[in-house]
């Protein structure tokens, strides 16, 4: 992994300077997500169709991230790691996720947790 050990600030500088693209970061994040999934079953969902975003001055712009599965993410399976919600796909975004998305961050996976995060 070439970029995943760098800080958000370091990644943002590389993005701003054109030394790396958001697409490259997404691809590396997805590759790592699949490797971790095979070994640890750490994700409810891996978003292989995550899209590159335009880079802005916001430090989160173009940065891939994972979100706990108890956050509602519009159009993406959000189970709370519970069989009760095993097919739940929300029609809205949780405020915290919406703020990350509006800042230009790119969700690449939903992480497993104890049922309902309890």
Please tell me what each predicted stretch does.
Residues 1-89, 93-94, 113-118:
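Short, well-ordered alpha-helical
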